[in-house]
């Protein structure tokens, strides 16, 4: 199977790409099952957080060169790329706006749309052996996968600009120093560490998780006054949930809160 899913305690779903899917993630044979798998965990009310990882040498290498070659020969490359991005981009948008926490355990090289998938997540734990590359310029393409929006917010506009225009390949250490990944973990504990983060971040309420993700993304492209109004609207809404009742009750009783509500996205 191109992809497998394991549900763990604490509401953590682990989605693992097979070695073949990791090296050719966005070929239809691999990407469609991957999309179906993520759709399933996103709609699972018992799932609070999702860990995505690959197998073998790659986390996700993005587009399949054989698919591109065939499409060029058949004179339908434009529609093929349109079809691929029509699937990928809504997925990335859902990851950014979902109430679920997404953590990527970057076990190997991430390139093209596969790098976009990692950058769209909330947290990235990276193997010291992994490498990050855009790959687009070497193919004569402009970037996709949300990278021109995501990467500048993590590393700054000029670092991102050099990454693309120099067609740089970052080591895991470089990616950590720039801020493109959050921490490095030995391959023997990489998945364990990613699950730990996913479980820890996923324990908070739906309103806290989803609202904060939305607010942080909005904060870089809006005025302060607008952001204050956005914060107010979300806080008023979240104050009327059972989770807020639990938060106040647990505070007064001096115990840890236990949030459990679920909202449709």
Residue ranges and their predicted role:
Residues 93-209, 237-241, 245-249, 255, ...:
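Crotonase-fold acyl-CoA enzyme core
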Residues 220, 256-265:
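Short C-terminal tail/terminal secondary-structure segment
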Residues 30-34, 84-87, 231:
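Hydrophobic alpha-helical membrane-association signature
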Residues 54-91, 110:
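Glycine- (often His-adjacent) and acidic-residue-rich active-site loop
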Residues 1-55, 93:
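Conserved CoA-thioester-binding segment of acyl-CoA-metabolizing enzymes
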């Amino acid at each position: 199977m191109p992809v497998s899913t394991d549900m763990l305690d604490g509401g953590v779903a682990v989605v693992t790409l097979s070695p073949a899917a990791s090296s050719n993630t966005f070929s239809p044979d691999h990407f469609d099952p991957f999309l179906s798998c993520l759709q399933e965990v996103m709609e699972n009310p018992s799932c609070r957080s999702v860990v995505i990882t690959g197998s073998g040498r790659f986390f996700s290498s993005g587009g399949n060169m054989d698919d591109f070659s065939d499409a060029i020969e058949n004179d339908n490359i434009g529609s093929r790329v349109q079809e691929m991005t029509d699937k990928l981009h809504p997925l990335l948008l859902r990851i950014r706006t979902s109430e679920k926490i997404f953590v990527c355990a970057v076990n190997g090289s991430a390139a093209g749309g596969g790098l976009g998938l990692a950058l769209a997540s909330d947290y990235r734990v990276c193997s010291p052996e992994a490498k990050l590359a855009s790959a687009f310029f070497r193919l004569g393409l402009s970037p996709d996968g949300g990278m021109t929006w995501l990467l500048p917010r993590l590393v700054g506009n000029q670092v991102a600009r050099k990454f693309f225009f120099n067609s740089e390949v970052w080591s895991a250490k470089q990616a950590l120093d720039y801020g493109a990944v959050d921490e490095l973990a030995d391959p023997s504990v990489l998945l364990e560490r990613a699950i730990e983060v996913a479980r820890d971040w996923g324990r908070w309420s739906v309103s806290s998780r989803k609202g904060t993700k939305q607010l942080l993304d909005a904060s870089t492209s809006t005025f302060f006054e607008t952001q204050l109004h956005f914060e107010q609207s979300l806080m008023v809404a979240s104050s009327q949930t059972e989770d807020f009742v639990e938060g106040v009750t647990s505070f007064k009783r001096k115990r840890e809160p236990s949030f459990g509500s679920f909202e449709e996205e």
